[in-house]
Amino acid sequence: TLFREFAEKEVKPLAQEVDETEVFPRATVEKMAKYGFLGIPVPKEYGGQGCDPLTYAMCVEELAKVCGTTAVIVSAHTSLCIDPIMTYGTEEQKQKYVPALAKGEKLGAFGLTEPGAGTDAQGQQTKAVLDGDEWVLNGSKCFITNGKEADVYIIIAVTGTIEKRGRKVKEISAFIVEKGTPGFTFGTK
């Protein structure tokens, strides 16, 4: 398959170096974008390939066979950034973000993990407060796949509390945040 050939030819020769140096494989990601790997399950009307989930899974599997890092870059971009926008975003958000993400012009990431909570969504400390017609997020995330390399982030934050099964629980929401948003900064590795 195209995925296997690409993985063997373009990804495998660099896999050990990528893992040892922890340098983001930008050139490889750009090549994957050229081949349409970053938008495989995205409908064609949003700039993707319009393929089924099995085709996408085959791509990630072939990449993972030779380089787990590269497979995770693709899956975080596609499954954790594009998919929430496609599933829960407004039409305006889909039109604004998905075509550039699906074509690989922009890279996506997902921010859930926090220093004191790990991936426990109910342990989240990052808060979002509505200020006029804008949400203001305040908190810290860590271990974000595609981190500093990404352009568009899905960030998880607490927006309030709700009653669930007789007890109060945190209401968790997802926000689309663009790199360059005032106050959105990166710590050191």
Predicted regions and their residues:
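N-terminal glycine-rich flavin-associated loop
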Residues: V72-E92, G118-A121
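Cytochrome P450 C-terminal beta-domain/meander region
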Residues: D120-N138
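Short, solvent-exposed loop/turn elements at beta->coil junctions and helix N-caps
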Residues: L112-A117, C142-F143, K189
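Short, intrinsically disordered, charge-balanced linker/junction segments flanking boundaries
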Residues: T1, G187-K189
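A short, Trp-centered hydrophobic/proline-enriched beta-strand micro-motif
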Residues: G104-L112, I156
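A short core secondary-structure module
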Residues: E134, N138-G187
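Conserved protein kinase catalytic domain
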Residues: V60, I82-I85, V98, I154, ...
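Amphipathic, small/basic residue-rich leader segments at the start of a protein or domain
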Residues: T1-A76, E92-K103, L107, L130
